Amino acid sequence: MPLFARLCQPQSRRMFSSISSFSALSVLRPQTGMLLNSSPLKTPSFTPLGFGLIGQRRWKSRGNTYQPSTLKRKRTFGFLARAKSKQGSKILKRRKLKGRWFLSH
């Protein structure tokens, strides 16, 4: 019997234990008594397990945040940029004294 046909049939002969009869959706469904007694300023004292994890991603993008640009790198950290500023010329001097072959990018 194909898998799809088995999934579509009702599972009447299957035995459920007390653990498997618990539904995660029942936790997410608000109780009517809770809604009547709560004020708009009060927040619920508990958050159901997994409530915030449904369909939520922590970050927008993953792994594509660094997009290197040679032009920007040389403009920011290049020799001419170092030579123009007072602090940059100190960096060039320090690297030259240390014996670096490459003073900047």
UniProtKB/Swiss-Prot annotation:
It comes from the Eukaryota. This is Large ribosomal subunit protein bL34m. Component of the mitochondrial large ribosomal subunit (mt-LSU). Mature yeast 74S mitochondrial ribosomes consist of a small (37S) and a large (54S) subunit. The 37S small subunit contains a 15S ribosomal RNA (15S mt-rRNA) and 34 different proteins. The 54S large subunit contains a 21S rRNA (21S mt-rRNA) and 46 different proteins. Keywords: Mitochondrion, Ribonucleoprotein, Ribosomal protein, Transit peptide. Present with 200 molecules/cell in log phase SD medium. It comes from Saccharomyces cerevisiae (strain ATCC 204508 / S288c). Component of the mitochondrial ribosome (mitoribosome), a dedicated translation machinery responsible for the synthesis of mitochondrial genome-encoded proteins, including at least some of the essential transmembrane subunits of the mitochondrial respiratory chain. The mitoribosomes are attached to the mitochondrial inner membrane and translation products are cotranslationally integrated into the membrane. Gene3D superfamilies: 1.10.287.3980. Transmembrane segments: none annotated. GO terms for molecular function: structural constituent of ribosome. One of its GO terms (cellular component) is mitochondrion. Residues 1-16 form a transit peptide. It is found in: Mitochondrion. The keyword Glycoprotein does not apply. HAMAP family: Ribosomal_bL34. Belongs to the bacterial ribosomal protein bL34 family.
